[in-house]
Every structure is written in structure tokens, then in C-alpha cells.
């Protein structure tokens, strides 16, 4: 059943899209000889190569951990990875819907609108990934015990070590797969990913024998950091990220505030259920309040949208 559900989820959307093609393509007048398949082959080959590299890259740490150490540590590591990826999915949800828009603006040479959308997207990524990263560091014990049970306590530190990848992958995903890809700079994404894969492999070779799944977590965090840095440097000519814009500085200020708040709550209540519940609720309230005080564009837009929905 699991295999059937997985396959259906993967290909189901494509099957429905095939039937919807009839609204856009006239199959009665369709002729194969009119297709210029070769002009699509090279871009598709780059995507194929990138997917292969990413597939090897994301599974390398788990394979090496099981080969060098044992399956028990793989289980601890896998638990931390799964929760981290679930949290990361919240941030990455925006990227999927933005790629067609980026591609359209780039193809029509609307570079001013392209840059404005890119700046806004990067700011959104930073504004969402930073508090999630901090939350994952503080809430790792509660999350591991909630979803995996007390037997997976060794997964807690691994999850905390890997928490920075939420920020790194979110930025590199938006910059690489959306912005640079839309600009036709797929090679930069491929080079960056290859460098990350090599660094990950080398670090795993040195760290896993001594530190086990913690070493794998360190290797993954450093590798993802290097992917992001290399991508930013190589792509700077085509798009430069303004990390210290007024909007982004607001996110740093708000994130620093919730760090102090969580440290205070942790000292007051200890690491338990009360800290978990109060920490999440108060962090969300404080974070949004600071953004509202600083007149953050996303909060203002959300407020306007809610008012319009209520009074509509």
C-alpha cells in the first residue's frame, strides 16, 4: 500500500496534467516533425545531471554512516533528518510557485520586476527560516520525544547540529533553483552542488568514524553552508543578495529577541511540555509583534488581506 500511495502521489499530478493539455494543445493538428526536440535536450540534460548529483548528495551521509558505523546510528540520524526536512518544507513551499514567474520575467527581459521579486522572495526566506531554525534548536528535545519517543534521545543533538541547514538550503534553493535557473545559469547551481557533495564526502570520511551521526550532521551543515556561499559568490554578477537591507535587519532583530525569550523560559520552566507550548506561542506572538512594529511589508499585506476577508 505504501508503494502504491507513493507512486500515485508522484505521478498522479502528471496524469491529470496530460488530460488538461487538450485545452492548450490541438492534438488533431499535431505533427511530430514540427517538434524541435534537440533544443530542449541540453537544458533537460542539465536538470537531469543536477537531480542525479542532488540524489547522491542527500543520501551520501546516511549510506556512509551505515557503512562506516552501524544501523543504530543511522536510525538516530534518520529521525533528526526527517523532522528537519519537514520543517524545511514549510520554507521551501514558496519556491515551487515562484519559478514560472521568475522564468516569465527573465524571458521578457523585465529585469527590474525580476530583481524586485527576487529581493522580496529572499527576504521572505530569511524571515521564515531564521525563527524556524532557532525554534528547532530549542525545541529539538520536545520534537524528538513527541515524534520518535525517548529511545531516540541521541537524535536531539544531531538535530540541533543540523538546524542551520534550514537557512542554508532555503537560501540556496531560492537563489539557485529559482533565480539563477530562471536566468539560464544552471551551471552555477551544478558547480555549487558538486562542491558541496565533495566536501560532504570528505568530511564524512573524517568525522563519522569518531563522532558517528553527530559527525554526519556536522558534515551536512558545513557542506550546505559551502553550497550556499559558493552559489552566492558565483551568482553575484547576475543577482546580489542584500543581507543587510532594512527588512532583513528587522528579521535579525526579531530572531535575536526570541532567542533571549526562549533562554529565559528555558531557565524558568526547564526543558518540558510547558516550555514547549509557551515557547512556541510566545515566540510567534513576539516575532510577529516586532515585525508589525517595524512595519514589515509581509505583515502589513497579511493584515490587509485579513481585513478584506473579514469585511468582504
What does each model-found stretch correspond to?
Residues 3, 15-58, 97, 101-116, ...:
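Interhelical loop/hinge segments that connect adjacent transmembrane helices in multipass membrane
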Residues 59, 68-71, 182-183, 210:
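Helix-loop interface residues and adjacent transmembrane-helix termini in multi-pass membrane transporters
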Amino acid at each position: 500500500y505504501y508503494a502504491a500511495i507513493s507512486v500515485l502521489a508522484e505521478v498522479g499530478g502528471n496524469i491529470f496534467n496530460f488530460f488538461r493539455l487538450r485545452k492548450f494543445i490541438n492534438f488533431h493538428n499535431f505533427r511530430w516533425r514540427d517538434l524541435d526536440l534537440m533544443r530542449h535536450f541540453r537544458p533537460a540534460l542539465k536538470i537531469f545531471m543536477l537531480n542525479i548529483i542532488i540524489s547522491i548528495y542527500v543520501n551520501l551521509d546516511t549510506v556512509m554512516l551505515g557503512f562506516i558505523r552501524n544501523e543504530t546510528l543511522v536510525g538516530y540520524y534518520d529521525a533528526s533528518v526527517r523532522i528537519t526536512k519537514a520543517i524545511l518544507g514549510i520554507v521551501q513551499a514558496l519556491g515551487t510557485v515562484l519559478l514560472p514567474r521568475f522564468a516569465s520575467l527573465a524571458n521578457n527581459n523585465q529585469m527590474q520586476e525580476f530583481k524586485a521579486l527576487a529581493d522580496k522572495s529572499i527576504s521572505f526566506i530569511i524571515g521564515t527560516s531564521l525563527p524556524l531554525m532557532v525554534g528547532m534548536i530549542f525545541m529539538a528535545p520536545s520534537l524528538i520525544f513527541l515524534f520518535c519517543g525517548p529511545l531516540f534521545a541521541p537524535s536531539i543533538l544531531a538535530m540541533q547540529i543540523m538546524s542551520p541547514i534550514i537557512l542554508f538550503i532555503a537560501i540556496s534553493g531560492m537563489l539557485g533553483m529559482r533565480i539563477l535557473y530562471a536566468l539560464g545559469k544552471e551551471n552555477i547551481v551544478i558547480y555549487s552542488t558538486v562542491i558541496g557533495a565533495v566536501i560532504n564526502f570528505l568530511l564524512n570520511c573524517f568525522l563519522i568514524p569518531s563522532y558517528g551521526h553527530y559527525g554526519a550532521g556536522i558534515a551536512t551543515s558545513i557542506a550546505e553552508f559551502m553550497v550556499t556561499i559558493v552559489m552566492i559568490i558565483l551568482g553575484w554578477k547576475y543577482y546580489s543578495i542584500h543581507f543587510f537591507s532594512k527588512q532583513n535587519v528587522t528579521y535579525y532583530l526579531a530572531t535575536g529577541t526570541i532567542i533571549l525569550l526562549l533562554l529565559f523560559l528555558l531557565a524558568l520552566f526547564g526543558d518540558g511540555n510547558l516550555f514547549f507550548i509557551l515557547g512556541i506561542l510566545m515566540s510567534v506572538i513576539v516575532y510577529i509583534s516586532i515585525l508589525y512594529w517595524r512595519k514589515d511589508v509581509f505583515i502589513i499585506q497579511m493584515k490587509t488581506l485579513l481585513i478584506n476577508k473579514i469585511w468582504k
